[in-house]
Amino acid sequence: MSVLHNDWAPIVEEEYEKTYYLKLKQFLMEEYRTKTVYPDEGDIFNALQLTPFGKVKAVILGQDPYHGPGQAHGLSFSVKPGVKTPPSLKNIFKELNGDLGYDIPEHGYLNQWAQEGVLMLNTVLTVRRGEPNSHKGAGWEQFTDQIIKRLNERETAMVFILWGKNAQEKEALITNPQHHIIKSPHPSPFSAHRGFFGSHPFSKTNDFLRGVGIEEINWNIEKSSDL
């Protein structure tokens, strides 16, 4: 698994010697050796690599990575360029268009958001091909809970965007009154019409950031995938 080269490194290194993480590491070594697992090993920590701790303005929590070939690359909801945009992400883009009027991109590659300070974090960071939730309970939840707890402790305010029940279970970890929580149903086609559409998470995030003197996020994504 890749080593981080930013201010997440000392935070993450505290986890490396814990019993749960050593077991997780052994489990993953065997899984990657004997099964097809996503994302590529070098992409597991992309969310942390692309959005340093001190630069986080907002957190979008996902569940586990996409389990189809070529989709997952370490950012929640995002897919690699050239891969068909999944249904939940299509709905995210529809809401972005309705909220801020931005054109819907032809791709689902969200690196630009990550570079804008949006931590695109799944609560489980790996998955077997074709088997959603196959790495649930292997130890990732403890790891990502620690990430959320450390963000919660940070003095500079941020927004936690919690879509759906699984993400909203993490609300208990967010106790710092400096931070702001935005909740709605999940953007999945099964629930988007129950309150995700029309929830305006992008403008609400920027309204909060502006109110506390933090530069707004540019949510506009380049339309073409020639990145």
Swiss-Prot record:
GO terms for molecular function: uracil DNA N-glycosylase activity. The active site is at residue 64. Keywords: Cytoplasm, DNA damage, DNA repair, Hydrolase. It catalyses: Hydrolyzes single-stranded DNA or mismatched double-stranded DNA and polynucleotides, releasing free uracil. Its main location: cytoplasm. InterPro entries: UDG_fam1, Ura-DNA_Glyclase_AS, Uracil-DNA_glycosylase-like, Uracil-DNA_glycosylase-like_sf. It is found in: Cytoplasm. It comes from the Bacteria. The keyword Ribonucleoprotein does not apply. The keyword Cytoplasm applies. Its EC number is 3.2.2.27. GO terms for cellular component: cytoplasm. GO terms for biological process: base-excision repair, AP site formation via deaminated base removal. Belongs to the uracil-DNA glycosylase (UDG) superfamily. UNG family. Excises uracil residues from the DNA which can arise as a result of misincorporation of dUMP residues by DNA polymerase or due to deamination of cytosine. This is Uracil-DNA glycosylase. It comes from Alkaliphilus metalliredigens (strain QYMF). The lineage of its organism: Bacteria, Bacillati, Bacillota, Clostridia, Peptostreptococcales.
